């Protein structure tokens, strides 16, 4: 089965995120966001961050310390990807969901939920 463009963007985002966790450099991941993108979190008291510079600053100020793995894609629409994720340290335990809204194969909005 061929992967959809949305699934490819999700897979690329996870690979680039994990690369950033390992190296401390999230610049390749940030390239996937539109200039006016929004990063929001549900279940933790941070954000939202609007615009690529604000998102970059958020990752610089509070870099994640664990990689993520995708457990399953629950739903995928024309411009939307919803995926359950886990932290690599606990790959069998669902940590939350990532909801990516796309515009021209770039991330326009990313909502990360915990729990």
Where would I find each of the regions flagged by the language model?
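Short glycine-enriched, charge-decorated loop/helix-capping segments at active-site entrances
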Residues: 44-47
